[in-house]
Amino acid sequence: PDRTVRSLTITRIVTVNLQTDEIGQYLYRQELPANSNSEMVGLSATDFLVLERDGSFLYGGPNGAAGVTPDAQKQVYRIDLSTGTNLETVALLPGMVQDPDLGLTINGKTLEQVVLEGGWEALAAVGIYPVDKTLALDMVVAANYPHDKMEGLWRIDDSHLGVLNDDDFATWSTGGVLEQKMLDDATIDAGRLY
């Protein structure tokens, strides 16, 4: 595929069974195109918490008041792999091929290209579905999360979850000039555990 598929809501989750070396591959549907999924925490063999975020700052970041983003997305979803199609073991219909370089293709197109041209409905039409997900935590609502990045999840126990930000060493580059990474007009970003 080319760069046109980068701004989609489709991403993949790959699993490896360490006892059998069996590989699984599942689709995850993001809330917004080009969001990031930078962390997963296992709850069981099929249940996971997945971090999903955009790159915006709740209070404007380096752009100050002009960059305020009240709808910033910093969320954790609970997923169940057993609800999605395992792309490694899917029954191949006419036109489907397990390409050694591109993975499962449909009529010569990657799944990303299929979604680009026909939406998620085009995959559903051939029996391919993403994993189900439910919102477990919205950090903007729960903690007024001001950072652009959520990068770490820590399952403390069955009732507590730690969330870590990535402050990029509190630096930011604008036009190639290195400067302090700001959360708003007055606050320098810093690493923090929530």
Language-model segment annotations:
Residues 1-194:
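Sequence/structural signature of beta-propeller domains
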